């Protein structure tokens, strides 16, 4: 019996515009099938009831997922006033109601209280583990799940529209770990009412933006025409804010063997000039950098004391 083919060596990022009613896992499987890729993963789960940006990594790009996940995210969402549900979105059962309908002015007035570093209690229906079990599994079994508040960073929060008295459309830019559903609940409570997320769309993840995204049906059509590669972004796309180091073929060879390379004074200065503000403010002189040979990612590593030590090597060819 012939061995089943494992897939092709496809490397890069596909910025999928995930449709509603599809899990992130299903989306990854669909993209992996289209490209017949050996390996695939995604940068940040998007619930079935949400649409929008789902960056999908293929092949060697999966090694950069941790960096993509750390980037800020932008969500556009609609709060429906007057009803809180078990899941804090339109899928759950209504558990609390209110006749209070805030005005646009009242909504805008409370938003500054929810920016910066705030304490947020995650939804009971979330993937957070409680004593080794997922919170949503416990909640579905009928248990009263009590999660502790944790710090999250809300970079910006603004009111976009109030189409009617029952709805408000907002946009939030946040750091890792923030929940839109919790934000909707907390804003509603601050306004003396109840609320849940009626619609949710993610429009940015780190450096990945909506304009670069491709719908699944478009991707399938491109694949049918033999043009799926047009939607594939380079592996290093998720590493745009990391200092880049141009190296020679010989240096590339050494790094792929796991050996460090010596930085020329010029290279060291160029890397330092590219450092991010938080790295400059830190006391440690070590910082992460990306080595590139002819524009192709070779390795991620630590630059320190005139040397570059690889920590993660990419198996890519020019």
UniProtKB/Swiss-Prot annotation:
A Gene Ontology molecular function term of the record: tRNA pseudouridine(55) synthase activity
UniProt protein name: tRNA pseudouridine synthase B
Annotated HAMAP family: TruB_bact
SUPFAM superfamilies referenced in this protein's UniProt entry, alphabetically: Pseudouridine synthase
Family as reported in the entry's similarity comment: Belongs to the pseudouridine synthase TruB family. Type 1 subfamily.
Catalytic activity: uridine(55) in tRNA = pseudouridine(55) in tRNA
Family matches, as Gene3D superfamilies: Pseudouridine synthase
Upper lineage: Bacteria, Pseudomonadati, Pseudomonadota, Alphaproteobacteria, Maricaulales
Enzyme class, UniProt record, top EC level: isomerase
Gene Ontology biological process terms, A to Z: mRNA pseudouridine synthesis; tRNA pseudouridine synthesis
């Amino acid at each position: 019996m012939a061995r089943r083919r494992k897939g092709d060596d496809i490397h890069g990022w596909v910025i999928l515009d995930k449709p509603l009613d599809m899990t992130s896992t299903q989306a990854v499987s669909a993209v992996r099938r289209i490209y017949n890729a050996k390996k695939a993963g995604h940068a940040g789960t998007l619930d079935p009831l949400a649409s929008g940006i789902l960056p999908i990594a293929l092949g060697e790009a999966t090694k950069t997922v941790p960096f993509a996940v750390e980037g800020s995210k932008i969500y556009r969402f609609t709060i429906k006033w007057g009803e809180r549900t078990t899941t804090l979105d339109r899928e759950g059962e209504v558990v609390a109601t209110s006749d209070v309908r805030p005005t646009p002015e009242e909504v805008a007035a409370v938003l500054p209280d929810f920016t910066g570093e705030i304490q947020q209690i995650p939804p009971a229906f979330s993937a957070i583990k409680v004593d080794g079990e997922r919170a949503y599994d416990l909640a579905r079994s009928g248990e009263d799940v009590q999660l502790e508040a944790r710090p999250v960073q809300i970079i910006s929060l603004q009111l976009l529209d109030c189409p009617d008295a029952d709805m408000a459309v907002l946009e939030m830019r946040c750091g890792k770990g923030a929940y839109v559903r919790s934000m909707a609940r907390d804003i509603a409570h601050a306004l003396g009412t109840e609320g849940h997320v009626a619609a949710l769309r993610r429009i940015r993840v780190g450096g990945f933006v909506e304009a670069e995204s491709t719908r699944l049906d478009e991707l399938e059509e491109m694949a049918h025409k033999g043009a799926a590669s047009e939607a594939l972004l380079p592996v290093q796309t998720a590493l745009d804010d990391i200092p880049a180091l141009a190296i020679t073929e010989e240096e590339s060879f050494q790094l792929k063997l796991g050996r460090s390379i010596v930085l020329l004074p010029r290279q060291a200065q160029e890397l330092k000039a590219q450092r991010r503000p938080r790295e400059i403010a830190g006391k440690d002189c070590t910082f992460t950098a990306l080595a590139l040979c002819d524009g192709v990612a070779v390795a991620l590593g630590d630059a320190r004391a005139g040397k570059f030590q690889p920590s993660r090597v990419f198996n890519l060819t020019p």
